[in-house]
């Protein structure tokens, strides 16, 4: 298996569900992770939970709000993550989803 220790990752849709589990595993394996979600409250809660659970500081995990349907949010996420993670991104997990506005 690929050694992710000291790698840098962005995970969209990481405040809950599979995205949160991906983040948890990468943090357990020593990866620095930038969490991202449209839900700011849940995102910050997830960040805090991981910091307490794994004894991590602000240098190991961050949260950036991102609506993946908005190009400017992607730009802000990428720039913030590279700055926080102090280098290029090694892993990108696009977990956030979009649903079409359809009336049933």
Which residues does each predicted region cover?
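Canonical Rossmann dinucleotide-binding motif of NAD(H)/NADP(H)-dependent dehydrogenases/reductases
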Residues: 2-34
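Generic hydrophobic, amphipathic alpha-helix propensity
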Residues: 18, 43-46, 50
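Amphipathic, non-transmembrane alpha-helical secondary structure
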Residues: 20, 24, 28, 44, ...
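Conserved mid-core segment of classical short-chain dehydrogenase/reductases
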Residues: 99-104
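Structural signature of beta-strand start/N-cap positions in the alpha/beta core
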Residues: 8, 32, 62, 88-90
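Conserved glycine-rich Rossmann-like NAD(P)H-binding loop of the short-chain dehydrogenase/reductase
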Residues: 31-46
């Amino acid at each position: 298996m690929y050694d992710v220790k000291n790698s840098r990752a962005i995970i969209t849709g990481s405040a809950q569900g599979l995205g949160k589990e991906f983040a948890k595993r990468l943090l357990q394996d020593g990866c620095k992770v930038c969490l991202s979600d449209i839900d700011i409250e849940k995102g910050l809660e997830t960040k805090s939970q991981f910091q307490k659970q794994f004894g991590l500081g602000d240098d190991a995990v961050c949260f950036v709000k991102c609506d993946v349907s908005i190009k400017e949010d992607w730009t802000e996420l990428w720039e913030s993550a590279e700055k926080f993670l102090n280098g290029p991104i090694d892993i990108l997990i696009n977990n956030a989803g979009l649903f079409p506005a359809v009336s049933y």
